[in-house]
A protein has these predicted regions:
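Face-selective signature of the C-terminal outer-membrane beta-barrel domain
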Residues: 156-275
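Hydrophobic, lipid-facing positions within transmembrane beta-strands of outer-membrane proteins
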Residues: 53, 70-74, 107-111, 170-174, ...
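Short strand-turn segments of transmembrane beta-barrel domains in outer membranes
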Residues: 27-33, 41-76, 97-98
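Outer-membrane beta-barrel translocator/channel fold
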Residues: 5-6, 98-106, 112-172
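Transmembrane beta-strands of outer-membrane beta-barrel pores
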Residues: 59-63, 92-96, 117, 128-132, ...
Length: 275
């Protein structure tokens, strides 16, 4: 949905939705906010219920080989029983970049397990997100773009030629609930989704984000008319390195009251406690 996004021009790079209402606002690990369009989260993870094993494989590419943009998507899902299934989803997207040191690669792996019984259900999984972004700091001289025509953008000078950002994210999650119908079920009731019920549930989430930025002084633009990218080098006179990580643990117990139909006007009433 929405009206598109503004991005740096390369697949896999930083982006932001043009619709302000759709822009993410990360309370945890804000460094990853620029990659929200590429991240898999528990809310975005897919679960499947298939009659037969299902496999899907797609590969897309475009552009010249030296500036290639490509995407690889792979999915496999199958049932252990009619109500229990497991699946794996993998995505790899990226580009070699139009300008010097502009390449990007984003990868996602999602493993899922689900069981939906008449009263008990569970959805659990593991997610791995990874991004490797080369950072060139931008075009050194705007005139190379506005006043001159270059047939080969890769010869245009940039501020940084060997800087890189790396991101990694590991997520373990689980949501389970047990439903207690407020009236006796019949053999014809496949589920209690349309019956007055009370659900007791538990959700767990552990997420760890890690980011590392590196560059070198030798990889920075030089010249009499070039202002130094950094004014000072404090710890290492030839290179810089910055790393950050954050871990998030969430453990909650909740109760849902379903007065009538789950999809009705009053679907569910929620209450819970957790940390």
């Amino acid at each position: 949905g929405g009206i598109g996004s503004a991005y740096l021009g390369n697949l896999g790079g930083a982006s932001i939705p043009l619709d302000a209402a759709l822009r993410p606002d990360y309370r945890n690990f804000s460094f990853a906010q620029i990659l929200d369009a590429y991240l898999v989260t528990p809310d975005r993870a897919n679960f499947y219920n298939t009659k037969k094993p299902f496999t899907h494989l797609s590969y897309f590419f475009g552009g010249q080989k030296k500036r290639l943009e490509e995407s690889l998507w792979a999915t496999h899902a199958q049932q252990i029983s009619p109500s229990t299934g497991m699946n794996i989803d993998y995505k790899s997207r990226g580009t070699r970049g139009t300008y010097t040191n502009q390449g990007a690669r984003d990868k996602n792996l999602s493993l899922g397990f689900s069981h939906t019984g008449k009263k008990y259900s569970i959805h659990a999984g593991y997610i791995y997100n990874m991004a490797s972004l080369k950072e060139n700091g931008g075009i050194l001289r705007d005139g190379d773009i506005t006043d001159t025509v270059f047939d080969m953008p890769e010869v245009i000078d940039v501020y940084l030629t060997d800087a890189k950002n790396e991101y990694k994210n590991n997520v373990f999650y689980l949501t389970q609930s047990y439903g207690m119908p407020l009236r006796r079920l019949s053999d014809e009731d496949f589920s209690i989704a349309e019956r007055s019920s009370v659900f007791i549930g538990h959700s767990f989430l552990y997420s760890r984000f890690w980011r590392k930025y590196t560059d070198t002084k030798s990889g920075m633009a030089k010249g009499e008319d070039v202002k130094p990218y950094y004014e000072h080098w404090y710890i290492n006179p030839t290179a810089s390195r910055d790393s950050t990580f954050e871990s998030l643990l969430s453990n909650k117990v909740f109760v849902q009251l379903q007065p009538w139909d789950r999809n009705g006007v009053v679907g569910v009433i929620n209450a819970g406690i957790g940390y």
